[in-house]
Regions:
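Residues embedded in well-ordered beta-strands within globular domains across many folds
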Residues: 13, 50-53, 139, 178, ...
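Hydrophobic, regular-secondary-structure patches
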Residues: 1-72, 76-82, 114-115, 165-166, ...
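Membrane-embedded alpha-helices of multi-pass transport/permease systems
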Residues: 238, 247-248
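Hydrophobic alpha-helical segments typical of transmembrane helices
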Residues: 38-41, 48, 112, 160-163, ...
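Mid-to-C-terminal secondary-structure elements
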Residues: 74, 79-94, 98, 103-207
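Residue-level detector of beta-strand face positions
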Residues: 61, 125-129, 213
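Peri-transmembrane interface segments
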Residues: 1, 194, 205-241
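Short, flexible, glycine-rich and Lys/Arg-enriched loop motifs at helix boundaries
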Residues: 19-29, 199-211
Length: 248
């Protein structure tokens, strides 16, 4: 439950592809149904969102001088910080102008700083390389540490989504869209509105299934609670069987 709350208040996640097709769950990274035009339509037309950001990522090695570290560069918009409850502690977030120009800039987390700049030097203004592309560090995120599942939330690199799409991946589609509803009570209204806009954009007929998947923070919490309840029941059953087998 704590991990879900750490992801950001009222968060809504939109992924390409149907949740299930022919009884088989699809790999979202292989789907290309979400385009920049979808993000722009949602940004301009929705009434129940406080923030929205595209998401596209590329994995590889980060290099600074003689130091390197495996990481993913996440291409996002400026509102991603609000959605994920992140704060720039040193320097600044990249700008809309950087997004428009596909600027080779990035914002990094503390784990990246510690591994690429172990001498303690200020990374802001320095160049790191990813897939032979130089990225100038413009900001460092405030540390969030590890989440309740033991995942390092500081091993993060953010760059303009246009930079990742054009310079790193050479793709025209998105791997996802993150958004925040204005309030928790408005989440359902927001998802309905998102569904209507995307179905219209994708020219889907009434009989067509959605070619995208929407998940809300509330849904994730419910799923996690259900899984926890199931595991609790399962463990209780196993314990009971053990007692019977042991003759207790």
């Amino acid at each position: 439950q704590q991990q879900i709350s750490e992801m950001g208040s009222n968060m809504i996640m939109i992924h390409p592809g149907a949740d299930m097709r022919g009884g088989v769950r699809q790999d979202p990274s292989a789907m290309q149904t979400l385009k920049l035009a979808d993000y722009e339509a949602l940004r301009d037309e929705t009434n129940f969102l406080s923030a929205i950001s595209p998401n596209v990522s590329s994995s590889g090695q980060l290099i600074a001088g003689n130091n390197n570290y495996p990481a993913s560069v996440n291409g996002v918009g400026t509102e991603y910080l609000d959605i994920r409850q992140l704060t720039v502690e040193n320097g600044e977030m990249f700008t809309e102008a950087d997004i428009q120009s596909s600027a080779k800039v990035c914002v990094i987390g503390k784990t990246i700083v510690d591994n690429l700049f172990p001498d303690g030097s200020d990374p802001v203004g320095k160049i790191i390389r990813f897939s032979k592309i130089p990225l100038r560090v413009v900001g460092v995120l405030k540390s969030k540490g590890y989440n309740s599942m033991g995942q390092d939330q500081d091993a993060v690199v953010l760059a303009p989504y246009t930079t990742v799409m054009k310079r790193l991946l050479a793709v025209t589609y998105l791997q996802g869209v993150f958004a925040s509803a204005l309030t928790e009570d408005m989440t359902d209204y927001a998802t309905e509105e998102i569904t209507e806009i995307l179905r219209r954009n994708h020219k889907l007929k009434a009989s067509d299934d959605d070619d995208f998947t929407i998940r809300t923070q509330q849904e994730l919490s419910t799923m996690l609670n259900s899984t926890t309840d199931l595991m609790t029941t399962l463990l209780a059953c196993i314990a009971g069987i053990s007692l019977v087998v042991g003759g207790i």
